[in-house]
């Protein structure tokens, strides 16, 4: 094994590092011909080279990277892992369960400990129950701790018992913003040895960290657990798409508008499973916060990551966010020596180059059901109206032409009566790390609110307004600048530091509005500064959801409707009866920049992050036991020991793939929200019945996301989204299917199949599993007895999660679909999987019905050799436990 370590001295300190320049000479390649992300992967392989997980062949293959047709796979070990609590609780539950399994099989509980640093940020549990007043924040936090006491006690136990594990307490910030502003070192200095920060996160928007020059992406909790326990993550060497940015953003456009445009454009380029790198002269004009907004939305454009290389702006941001001067100097020196510092004169070899003219970006929103459906602001009214009557699907609601005329009169207790019409803005939320990490758009929203209040405008009480920033720094500069009182005046009071509306924790609508929506079947809207707007995600009563920049969120709240052209119609009328237009109160770019210069300072970051792990008194007061193994509470409805290790043996699993029945048949764009919802638990659902049988009242249901530590709730919640459309349910929308001629909840049908020893298959269209990195979408399917998913295409993370839970992902061959093969879903299926399957094998499937048997071929979506090992072990979790017990 050749040693490629080099040394340099900076400020009289000696540092060591893996020298890519030295290694590239040995392999006779031009280092600067490689994309930055490939160089980061190479450094990792050289550093982790052990001839077991990482071989010389892996290194050679990557050094000779062929951008036009990459071959081979990467065994990648990230530097660290970050968790949020919705996905983090099941990760810690699995670790605790692994400890039990190890002990039961004669091993030590200490075999199960994270081998790399792990940070858990608790941000997904706070809900917007209270809003629109000064007490909302405290009231929501009190309720959050009350609802989640069991979960928080469990996470506190984990902090005490596991090595290499820290928890950022509730009411501190949003995972990706805290990661960007505080947790990431960009370049890690471990006892004088330097290497790039790289990471996995159990949240798809982990990609935000690529804005600061750190390679990272979202993985399922299962893959994160494996990485934490020392396993490499195997994936095909990716294509790298270069996105050349040129020109300059117009004064009226924001980073949000750019991110939405990038999402639209790259979705059309089909960058799923590919790396994206941004370069070009336009890069210099983008602040780091702008880059982070674009990087955050990589899951929406489908890429594994959207990477911005380290440059002067990276260092400026590190200084702003109070990283030490010594570490900033070290970051620059290391990045330059290892050719990881952006070089404008060099063009790496990309698979393809896509060009985006920044000067052509216009104020926009996206919706009503997908982030990639971009609408220029001037066309928003026209597009909203068209979506109402367009055929039901990802861009339409399939309603009648009379829908626009629908309205209801809302009666308030104080005697006030207000009219609510189709398109009413029921929710206006400044939310999500995507935008609240960006001072430009937050201060723009504050300045717009100031000008609106000064003109006498107000927001109707039928609109639920909220402000939930991703860090305390945001509220600090909004207060310091004097803008928060104006936001408060319009109802955008602080409701919490967490994901809230962006992930479906929007709370109930204004009760009077909710009543009107249900009684009149009104189609109402949400406008949020989030990153996802899939149907049913934001609020079950809100069908049309639009992503917008924070200033546009405030503007739509003032207008009160999405059935309006904000570029030509007034938002309202001032105290003199004069019309007030958006252009009248939208702040000028120079004004916003002057506020940033005055009020966004390193001192704020120092103050707010100085004691981030110990500041929360509520968290500090939680008492927990001191034990290596968790003492499971059998009556808990939040935390239960999952059954993944009940049949743990040393033999590999043989899985019968004959006589499979179809549990569900879906169309295109089925998201992980559809498969495993995170939001409210519907009153008439199987999960609700389980909770009620265990003494939980409706008021205490909490959300699916908060109950991910209990497999009994989660398996009942699988395919239970109220908006999911199963083609086997005779037109009934929601989590239903046909079982022996009867329409049943999918959970009940699955249990009937299991009771009778029948395994199942799910059939789907394109982009199956798009959206959040939700491992429960695979875990739940596994517990329901699903053995195979056959789809036209898969989103990257979900395909990986399926394999890691022992579910076989099969893909229709190009040009074939369930429809073209005339598959109804009422057949019985047999998959002829070879005894020794290989990556991307073509396998035969038989579908038998009364009419006879159809045979067709499909693509086996094992994308790496590791997938085969995971599948043959019944999943990665049993495999890891076996390895630990065998001294691996």
Curated annotation (Swiss-Prot):
Q: Which InterPro entries match?
A: AcnA_IRP_Swivel, Acnase/IPM_dHydase_lsu_aba_1/3, Acoase/IPM_deHydtase_lsu_aba, Aconitase/3IPM_dehydase_swvl, Aconitase/IRP2, Aconitase_4Fe-4S_BS, Aconitase_4Fe-4S_dom, AconitaseA/IPMdHydase_ssu_swvl
Q: Which reaction does it catalyse?
A: citrate = D-threo-isocitrate; (2S,3R)-3-hydroxybutane-1,2,3-tricarboxylate = 2-methyl-cis-aconitate + H2O
Q: Which UniProt keywords apply?
A: 4Fe-4S, Iron, Iron-sulfur, Lyase, Metal-binding, RNA-binding, Tricarboxylic acid cycle
Q: Which SUPFAM superfamilies match?
A: Aconitase iron-sulfur domain (SSF53732), LeuD/IlvD-like (SSF52016)
Database matches in Pfam families: Aconitase, Aconitase_C
Q: Which PROSITE patterns match?
A: ACONITASE_1 (PS00450), ACONITASE_2 (PS01244)
Q: Where does [4Fe-4S] cluster bind?
A: 433, 499, 502
Pathway of this protein? Carbohydrate metabolism; tricarboxylic acid cycle; isocitrate from oxaloacetate: step 2/2; Organic acid metabolism; propanoate degradation
* UniProt cofactor note: Binds 1 [4Fe-4S] cluster per subunit.
- Report the domain of life of the source organism: Bacteria
Any stretches that span the bilayer, and where are they? none
Entry's EC annotation: 4.2.1.3, 4.2.1.99
Cofactor(s) the record lists: [4Fe-4S] cluster
One GO molecular function term of this record is:
mRNA binding
Biological process (GO) annotations held by this record are: propionate metabolic process, methylcitrate cycle; tricarboxylic acid cycle
Which family is this protein grouped under?
Belongs to the aconitase/IPM isomerase family.
Quaternary data = Monomer.
User: Which NCBIfam families is this protein grouped with?
Assistant: aconitase_1 (TIGR01341), PRK09277.1 (NF006757), PRK12881.1 (NF009520)
General function of this protein: Involved in the catabolism of short chain fatty acids (SCFA) via the tricarboxylic acid (TCA)(acetyl degradation route) and probably the 2-methylcitrate cycle I (propionate degradation route). Catalyzes the reversible isomerization of citrate to isocitrate via cis-aconitate. Could catalyze the hydration of 2-methyl-cis-aconitate to yield (2R,3S)-2-methylisocitrate. The apo form of AcnA functions as a RNA-binding regulatory protein.
Q: What is this protein called?
A: Aconitate hydratase A
- Tell me which species this is from: Streptococcus mutans serotype c (strain ATCC 700610 / UA159)
Which gene is this protein's source?
acn
